[in-house]
Amino acid sequence: MSDIIHLLPDSVANQIAAGEVIQRPASVIKELVENAIDADAQNIHVLVTDAGKTCIQIIDDGKGMSETDARLSFERHATSKIREAADLFALRTMGFRGEALASIAAVAQVELKTRLESEELGTKLVIAGSKVESQEAVSCSKGSNFSVKNLFFNVPARRKFLKANSTELSNILAEFERIALVHPEVAFSLYSNDSELFNLPVSPLRQRILAIFGKKLNQQLLNIEVNTTMVKISGYIAKPETARKKGAHQYFFVNGRYMRHPYFHKAVMEAYEQLIPVGEQVSYFIYFEVDPANIDVNIHPTKTEIKFENEQAIWQILSASVKESLGKFSAIPSIDFDTEDMPDIPAFEQNLPPAPPKIHYNSDFNPFKVSSGGSGGGSYSRPKVEWEGLYGGLTKASKMNEPQQEPEMDWENSPFEEEPMVAEEKTISAVSAASSTFSSASSTLYANESVIEKGNLHLQFKGRFILTSVKSGLMLIDQHRAHIRVLFDRYMVQIKQKQGVSQGVLFPEILQLPASEAAVLQGIMDDLSAVGFDLSDLGGGSYAINGIPSGIEGLNPVELVRNMLHTAMEKGNDVKEEIQNILALTLARAAAIVYGQVLSNEEMVSLVDSLFACPSPNYTPDGKTVLTTIKEEDIEKLFK
């Protein structure tokens, strides 16, 4: 048998390695911008065309490279950052593996212009698919100028799986923001299709945060700072009242590097546990400075997962520092020991006999004396109760749900026996008792009519469930979830057919977004318009909401659009279909009948019929149970 194992060509090996390092255009920008920072650049310009699919250009004023270094930098594992394994535990640079440039050159057409400050001429290098096409001297500025064109041109399968331009641009902006947040001492700019998205001058950290996410955040940030022999923690956390379900800006950085750390995230959120609703999040920008020997950066290709040697101790320090910051800025309830506004407490002399308290009273008052003239006397007459007024609103409300002609109810021969009331139930107010009686009578009446006319029983239980008999037993239907199921299917048809009805607003709402979110919003504008939203771009990340879908007048349109936007950013794949589902579900939840709403028999019948006309009546779009059936044999067992 002949030998079957052989070495792969460098070009193939580089393409395989690129699959880990270069996943999308944002990965290219991350690697090249980090290289520029390692080269001590003070100004970095990023230019992208078609969300980086056509061209990515990174221009910096860093140290630059010599002719030899420029050629060698595209070889695998060629780096200036480390020389031996021990250097991995003393890293102060962003890159160190020497894989990025080789991986980029393996799947794109790359042109590099670079010059050292001490040299008059620079070097121009052209590489495509790991093959050097040309290298020549050129006149250029100090630093480096990378141009990456036609990403994945030789890997069609990878290029085919790139997402929509809006999604890829959002990923680029996210990477750009992470780097800009950790290096406020560097000036950055970002252009997309010749449009300026960011122009960030050198500034303090707080100003850099506001420049990226908006000045509105300024009033929401609390300072956090603690310095120990193990770790130095600094940055900002948001006030509890700014919590939201989606869209919180949450960033951890360690030694100038962005990282994801679920364990430390729990430490931050634990401090907010009693201050914000369950399931909501707050923004934070937290920076760690740790001895490089106590962390391991080299455990993930993207270097975003970092292992700490003293993880549990740092968790405790982080949680305590967040709590301290919240308490210091009065973000949590605290005991006030300020005595400035306290009442004066008199000092009593000792050895004095106790004296009875002085009580002021009217010695001429006689409760049994009959008053004359009906005024100023001591008798008390109970005010007349206007009983009709108590039931006025109830009568009007009752008539709205009643049929045109209400038959007489035979109370004496009613088939239902009155349950004995316990003592606690008798304490209910007269109005509530009357309301319950009217509701019960109305439901009983409709039930009897249903039995007579259709032979099927529809009852409402606790203002939440609809009870109806089926062949196998008794079916319980959650009225709120059932209505969501029905409305969701209707809205989905409208969205897909672009038949959404828009209702104009008297005063347009203004939605202010950072650049990364604005890029995603541009990609889903058509889907928003299809369901009835009318948005206009005011520039600078500001959008005016001029119209909203009919039926959601009670909701905050800004928060509604923001929630759908953040969900689209999280999903990434199949954005259009996902947004359609989100829109339909959100609108269905907003317009659905609520728990406690009394339904007439006709309304219950209509809802049940509409539910079973749906393709999937058993569950809501988000997987919650709509109905359940109690089998007849199970009911019979209860009476054995």
From Swiss-Prot:
Name of the protein in its database record: DNA mismatch repair protein MutL
Classification of source organism: Bacteria, Pseudomonadati, Bacteroidota, Bacteroidia, Bacteroidales
GO biological process: mismatch repair
HAMAP family noted in UniProt: DNA_mis_repair
Lineage: superkingdom: Bacteria
InterPro entries listed in its UniProt record: DNA_mismatch_repair_CS, DNA_mismatch_repair_MutL, DNA_mismatch_S5_2-like, HATPase_C_sf, MutL/Mlh/PMS, MutL/Mlh/Pms-like, MutL_C, MutL_C_dimsub
Family of the protein in this entry: Belongs to the DNA mismatch repair MutL/HexB family.
CDD domains from the UniProt entry: HATPase_MutL-MLH-PMS-like (cd16926), MutL_Trans (cd00782)
